[in-house]
């Protein structure tokens, strides 16, 4: 396919979870930078970044160091998932069948769907409150519908439109946050801007964990946005475009939140602090962030839809849905989330975020297994046809080795967890720091490798696997 033909690709995406033929690939690797840079300059990462100085009482310097370390570490895992896209040509969650089996992958896929539905619902509530904050005459429920409709339309149109919006958003939001930094730093209203807080190792670890988990949360759908790139796009270029875009964008947003709350008197809500600290530009900054929420939330809807379709296709293996099916599922999720968000109690977002944090615990072992399997064991060579078979083809319905490593990866995290839904005994000795994700990664990775390489079925799978690039039968 020539560049002109690729640029002429239809705006409305026709694929869902099926294999993307080499002739249908399009786009440039730099699109991944703009997608993840623009998508991460938004209220939620700003609020999360402020927690290091608000909740864990770090000063600005140590807060920034913790943010940078967490983003740098978590971004590696996130970008390694992204680099699988051009090599495989299929969405991330359906590719998990190669590790867990056609039925074994169902649990992880359902969890991913629930998590991204939760993200979508919580973000439309945030969008509704933002609309009300900008124009008080607009009720929050109306604002919720406005935010949901905007994200829903973007998600239904699909991949190409999402990339176009984020190419524009990178420039607009990049300039906006740069001006915002200048306004805050030139109008600091506190005498303790640099001295408020201090250094506490436990608080520093907790901030690193929050920062790293922000990146890891993208892992189940990050390659959904790189799978359309031409198959000759290398792993390294995909990795670096994603890594730099996501880590730079989210690091700027995290630091912006920390700077904003330190520039105003202690105790102020983060977004109120942003509005006050940026002075006359405050309302404009809120408008930019609202547009960012709407655009970025389309990724959550898109990822949720693909995960739901993947789950259903497990039991209807001959069904490779089209754009119409994707639109129908999008509308169902959209309506359900609007209904729940409008009719729920005031602590809806808080409860939803608590659930999402708990679900991250079960996604960390999946991340470890997926990356070890792709890069170390199979080295990117898979039988794509088997992934779409009812019996899993050479991968089977269940992979006991992956499921055992997965279960152990969850269990070992439990004592280290510190979420609103459950707190293990160890965080109390670490000042509340939740290191469960790190423990899960460090145990699951070598355990899965050890189990997989000693399994005779693994050798059969490896011998039968073919490169995605050479497979032309899946439509």
Describe these PLM feature segments.
Residues 93-97, 125-142, 230, 300-331, ...:
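Helix-loop-helix connectors at the membrane interface of multi-pass transporters/channels
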Residues 128, 142, 146-184, 198-199, ...:
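Membrane-interface loop-to-helix entry segments
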Residues 262, 311-346, 394-413:
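Loop-to-transmembrane helix boundary motifs in multi-pass membrane proteins
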Residues 327, 366-446, 464:
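C-terminal membrane-solvent junction of multi-pass transporters and transport-like membrane proteins
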Residues 109-113, 134-157, 171-182, 211-222, ...:
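Transmembrane alpha-helical segments of multi-pass small-molecule transport proteins
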Residues 29-46, 181-187, 196-260, 279-301, ...:
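Hydrophobic, membrane-embedded alpha-helices of multi-pass small-molecule transporters
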Residues 1-62, 203-209, 227-237, 455-475:
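Membrane-interface "cap" regions at the ends of multi-pass membrane proteins
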Residues 171-197, 212-216, 255-263, 368-380, ...:
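Hydrophobic alpha-helical segments and their helix-loop junctions in multi-pass secondary transporters
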């Amino acid at each position: 396919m020539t560049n002109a033909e690729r640029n002429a690709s239809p705006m409305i995406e026709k694929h869902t979870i099926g294999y993307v033929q080499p002739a249908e690939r399009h786009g440039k690797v730099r699109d991944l930078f703009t997608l993840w840079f623009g998508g991460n300059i938004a209220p939620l990462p700003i609020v999360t970044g402020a927690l290091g100085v608000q909740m864990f009482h770090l000063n600005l310097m140590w807060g920034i160091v913790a943010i940078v370390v967490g983003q740098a570490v978590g971004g590696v895992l996130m970008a390694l998932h992204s680099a699988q896209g051009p090599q495989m040509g299929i969405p991330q969650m359906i590719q998990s069948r190669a590790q867990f089996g056609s039925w074994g992958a169902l649990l992880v896929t359902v969890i991913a769907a629930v998590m991204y539905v939760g993200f979508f619902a919580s973000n439309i509530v945030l969008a509704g409150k933002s609309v009300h904050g900008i124009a008080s005459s607009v009720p929050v429920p109306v604002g919720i519908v406005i935010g949901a409709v905007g994200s829903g339309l973007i998600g239904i149109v699909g991949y190409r439109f999402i990339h176009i919006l984020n190419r524009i958003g990178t420039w607009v939001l990049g300039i906006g946050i740069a001006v915002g930094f200048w306004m805050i730093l030139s109008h600091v209203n506190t005498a303790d801007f640099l001295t408020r807080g201090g250094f506490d190792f436990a608080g520093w670890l907790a901030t690193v964990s929050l920062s790293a988990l922000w990146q890891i949360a993208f892992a189940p759908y990050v390659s959904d946005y790189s799978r359309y790139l031409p198959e000759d796009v290398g792993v390294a270029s995909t990795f670096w475009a994603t890594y730099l875009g996501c880590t730079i964008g989210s690091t700027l947003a995290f630091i912006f939140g920390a700077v904003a709350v330190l520039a105003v008197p202690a105790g102020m809500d983060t977004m109120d602090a942003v509005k006050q600290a940026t002075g006359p530009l405050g309302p404009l900054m809120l408008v930019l962030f609202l547009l960012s929420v709407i655009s970025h939330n389309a990724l959550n809807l898109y990822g949720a839809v693909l995960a739901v379709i993947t789950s259903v296709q497990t039991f209807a293996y001959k069904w490779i849905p089209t754009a119409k099916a994707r639109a129908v599922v999008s509308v169902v999720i959209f309506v359900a989330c609007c209904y729940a968000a409008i009719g729920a109690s005031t602590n809806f977002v808080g409860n939803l975020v608590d659930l999402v944090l708990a679900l991250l615990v079960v996604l960390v072992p999946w991340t470890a297994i997926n990356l070890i399997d792709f890069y170390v064991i199979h080295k990117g060579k898979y039988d794509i046809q088997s992934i779409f078979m009812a019996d899993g083809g050479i991968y089977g319905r269940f992979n006991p080795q992956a499921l055992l490593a997965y279960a152990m990866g969850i269990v070992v995290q439990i004592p280290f967890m510190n979420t609103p839904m459950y707190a293990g005994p160890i965080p109390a000795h670490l000042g509340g720091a939740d290191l469960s994700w790190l423990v899960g990664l460090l145990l699951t990775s070598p355990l899965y490798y050890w189990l997989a390489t000693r399994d005779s079925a693994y050798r059969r799978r490896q011998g039968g696997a073919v490169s995605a690039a050479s497979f032309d039968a899946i439509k």
